[in-house]
Every structure is written in C-alpha cells, then in structure tokens.
C-alpha cells in the first residue's frame, strides 16, 4: 500500500486534488480499485498536511433485481471509522430490461454517477473521489480515439457546476497491477460484479489491444500518459 499512497500523494500534489477542510465522498463499487482508494485515503489522513473527512457511498444496480451483498465492505468501513451508505437502485432493470441498451456501459456509468453526485451532496461533501487508475486513463484515451473519433480522456479533477461538486481521481498515477497486488495483500473484501456484460465490454477489448500493441511498442502506456500531460489534454498538464 505504501507505493499506492506515494503515487496518490504525487497526483494530489500535481493537481491539487485535496485541500484542508475537504469532505470527500469515495464512490465504492465493491471492486478492487475503489476499495484500495478508500483504504489509502483513510490511512493518508494520518500524515498528509491537509485535514479532510471521508464518507463512503455505493450505488447498487441490483442486477436481476437482486441486492448485492456489501456486508464485508460495511465491516471494512466500520474498522476504518468511515460512514458508509448503500443506495439500492433499479439501474440493472432500466438498462437491460426496459431500455435493452446495445451499449449499456455508457448509460450505466452516467446514471450511476448521477446518483453518486446526489449522494455526495446529501452528505455535505464538496468532492467525489473515484477509483480510476493509470491504465483506465490510457484505455479511455484509446476508446475515445477508436470509438468516438476524438482526442481526449477523463480529467484528474473536474468541476460540476450544476452540483457545485468536484470530481477527483487520486489514483491516476497507480498502475492496475499494483492496485490489484495491494487489494490481495491486504485481503480487501472485493465484491464480484454481477453485471451481465462484465468481461465483454469495449474497455475489455481495448485493454487486450493495448497489451498486444505493447509487444511491438514497449512502454506505450507511459508514452500515452506523457503525451496527455505534455499537451495538457483535459487538464492532464501538471499544475506544479
């Protein structure tokens, strides 16, 4: 976890993601990324110069109208002394039964994020932290290029004026392999995704493509990240 926290600190310093007095909602999907982020931010409160509060929030899509079991995540939050709220929803039913979406991931992400925004404001948070990591950023760059025909990526930090809420991604310098290792080493209670298309998404296909490309172009992911920062695409140019 030490390396993860060091890389989070680098992102926090580079993009001024956290300031003293912040109240941060951490979006918890139950996956390894969000759980590692939660634990890291909780531990970093002990030594970061800025003082901040944390709340954990989850949107349960209730796929097949079945509530996901988050009891082990609740226990983790109790140990960390972090308030935790689960919002049960009908996202699974809306996306797969009512709308029958051909591209369900995009709609699900938008709807889930909208609920997370509302939950963040309910808990008087001024920031929402999501667990997107280094590899997510590189994959998003390629997905925007291949599927959207544009150069772009999500931002390390963005401001949602309609909600008066900052969206931050403190793990953008953390490689997925290191995140996975941390989750395993600390026996974090990862919740298996029940999404019907899990493992068969555009992001999964893009991830496999990047692996193939790196056989011919070593260090491709690092070069993409460097390009995002040097060109200051979508706020990736380091602030200091």
Model segments located where?
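Short, solvent-exposed polar/charged micro-motifs at secondary-structure junctions
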Residues: 95-98, 202-204, 233-234
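Catalytic subdomain that performs nucleotidyl-dependent activation
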Residues: 127, 135-215
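Short, basic, helix/turn surface patches
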Residues: 109-121, 157-163, 210, 214-229
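Generic structural signal for well-ordered, non-membrane alpha-helical segments
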Residues: 1, 109, 199-202, 206, ...
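ATP-dependent adenylation/nucleotidyltransferase module used to activate substrates
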Residues: 1-139, 147, 177-185
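Residue-level detector of flexible, active-site-proximal loop/helix-junction positions
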Residues: 61-63, 91-93, 158-161, 174, ...
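A short, charged, Gly/Pro-tolerant segment at domain boundaries
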Residues: 201, 219-240
């Amino acid at each position: 976890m030490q390396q993860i926290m060091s890389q989070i600190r680098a992102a926090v310093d580079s993009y001024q993601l956290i300031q003293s007095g912040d109240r941060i909602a951490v979006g918890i999907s139950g996956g390894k990324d969000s759980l590692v982020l939660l634990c890291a931010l909780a531990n970093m409160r002990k030594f970061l110069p800025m003082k901040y509060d944390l709340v954990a929030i989850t949107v349960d899509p209730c796929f097949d109208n079945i509530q996901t079991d988050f009891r082990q995540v609740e226990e983790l939050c109790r140990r960390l002394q972090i308030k935790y709220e689960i919002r049960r929803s009908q996202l699974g039913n809306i996306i797969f039964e009512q709308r029958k979406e051909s591209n369900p991931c995009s709609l699900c992400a938008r709807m889930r994020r909208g609920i997370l925004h509302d939950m963040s404001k309910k808990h008087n948070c001024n920031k929402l932290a999501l667990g997107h990591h280094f590899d997510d950023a590189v994959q998003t760059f390629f997905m925007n290029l291949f599927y959207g025909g544009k150069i772009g990526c999500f931002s390390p930090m963005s401001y949602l004026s309609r909600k008066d809420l900052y969206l931050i991604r403190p793990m953008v310098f953390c490689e997925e392999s290191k995140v996975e290792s941390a989750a395993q080493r600390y026996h974090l209670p990862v919740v298996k995704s029940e999404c019907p298309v899990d493992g068969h998404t555009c992001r999964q296909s893009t991830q496999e493509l990047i692996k193939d490309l790196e056989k011919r172009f070593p260090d491709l992911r690092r070069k993409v990240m460097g390009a995002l920062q040097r060109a200051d695409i979508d706020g990736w140019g380091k602030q200091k």
